Amino acid sequence: MFRVLNNDVYSPAVVQQQTTLAFGKASSLCTDNRSANDQCEMGENFRESGQDHVKRPMNAFIVWSRERRRKVALENPQMQNSEISKQPGYEWKRLTDAGKRPFFEEAQRLLAIHQDKYPGYKYRPRRKAKRPQNSLPSVSSILCNQMSVETLHPFTYRDGCAKTTYSPMESQLSRLQSMTSSLLQKEHHSSWTSLGHNRVTMATHIFADFPFYQSLEPRLSCAYFPY
């Protein structure tokens, strides 16, 4: 009986279970200690950053607007914050020099206290982070560039004695219109029995007569010539 109990206690399954439990406790302790250390370090960094930043001393308008804004908010609880912030500015402009004098005196007193507390203080405004500009061009700019490249390469040809300048797109469209009109006229006079055969033969003859068809780009030929 005693041997059986000892075998159960020292069996491989029990030993493995005990080791996994012990390892889990140790890892949890390590993670807890790391989180505590990280929190302490973050707290120290926040304190150091808060100590480095020193607020500017208040001027006369800020001294007056702080008190006045509180009074306006208490008198008008339903007023929005944007309207509450505008109200002290309007009233400050209406005040006379005698009405502004006590607030200027209070601002001078606060400035003297600030200079005694921070003798080497210099105002350094925080710079706003610049947004990264998109280095890749937009799709609309690419399309505009392609259209300008296609339309801004004119060529000249002679028709008798006159010289005329056309862009590639204009010349191709004009020739396509003349070709389609001639096809329609010839097909109108043809018989219904030989309509399919005449369409193919006329198209091949017309395309052979015009050499510019060979210089067309694949995208234009597929778009304008479905045969």
Curated annotation (Swiss-Prot):
GO terms for biological process: cell differentiation; male sex determination; sex differentiation. Keywords: Activator, Calmodulin-binding, Cytoplasm, Differentiation, DNA-binding, Nucleus, Repressor, Sexual differentiation, Transcription, Transcription regulation. It is found in: Nucleus speckle; Cytoplasm; Nucleus. One of its GO terms (cellular component) is nucleus. SUPFAM superfamilies: HMG-box. Residues 54-122 bind DNA. Its main location: nucleus. The keyword Transcription regulation applies. One of its GO terms (molecular function) is RNA polymerase II cis-regulatory region sequence-specific DNA binding. It comes from the Eukaryota. InterPro entries: HMG_box_dom, HMG_box_dom_sf, SRY, SRY-related_HMG-box_TF-like. Disulfide bonds: none annotated. Belongs to the SRY family. Interacts with CALM, EP300, HDAC3, KPNB1, ZNF208 isoform KRAB-O, PARP1, SLC9A3R2 and WT1. The interaction with EP300 modulates its DNA-binding activity. The interaction with KPNB1 is sensitive to dissociation by Ran in the GTP-bound form. Interaction with PARP1 impaired its DNA-binding activity. Transcriptional regulator that controls a genetic switch in male development. It is necessary and sufficient for initiating male sex determination by directing the development of supporting cell precursors (pre-Sertoli cells) as Sertoli rather than granulosa cells. Involved in different aspects of gene regulation including promoter activation or repression. Binds to the DNA consensus sequence 5'-[AT]AACAA[AT]-3'. SRY HMG box recognizes DNA by partial intercalation in the minor groove and promotes DNA bending. Also involved in pre-mRNA splicing. This is Sex-determining region Y protein. It comes from Moschus chrysogaster (Alpine musk deer). The gene is SRY.
